[in-house]
Amino acid sequence: MTALNRFVKWKTAAFAAVAVATLASTPALAGNDNDEFQFDLVSSAAFLPHAHGRVNIESVGPVEIMSVTVWGLPPNTDFDFFVIQVPKAPFGLSWYQGDIETNRYGVGFERFVGRFNIETFIVAPGPAPAPTPHLDQPFPDASSNLATAPVHTYHLGLWFNSPKDAEKAGGKPNVVTPFNGEHNAGVQVLNTSNFPDLQGPLSRVKPTP
């Protein structure tokens, strides 16, 4: 490893430690201005009681920028991040937002751009054929959708990408969920159950002109 690489790794670790300490001491729901909103993610896995996260959503007109920091998680582990209808099972309608990978300190960060506000919803005016690239059990793709009126999805959840990683961290063995790209994820570890089911945090974000 070169001196430059060592310096970059040291700076990254130091920044992560400072960021976590700062976030942990910042009151929840405190935004910097009217266009920002901050809130916590809380542990949903009993075997990881110290897992935590902080979300900052900044409204910038046509889109929002959602910055997610998580800590207290297993190091060097992949997780999958979803926007969901309700924070706990059965979760309702859900859509795959992206991945978060922790570093060797169990800290992860990712930034997402999209619509994350009171207007966030899923709609299916009618049934239609759907592609089926993933057919493995226990959660094969559906070949068509059900019709639904607009359903708002105001909650967030984070899942282990691998059931084996969840088991290694102390979870029950062989628990598989559909919450990753191949539909063979582990259990949920963080969510927004600190908000009511029908009043998830995204409902408090108003789009800016």
PLM feature segments, named:
Residues 2, 29-30:
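Intrinsic disorder/low-complexity signature
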Residues 2-14:
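Bacterial N-terminal signal peptides that target proteins for export
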Residues 25-27:
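N-terminal signal peptide c-region/cleavage motif recognized by signal peptidases
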Residues 30-209:
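N-terminal leader/targeting pre-sequences
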Residues 12-23:
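Hydrophobic helical h-region of N-terminal Sec-dependent signal peptides
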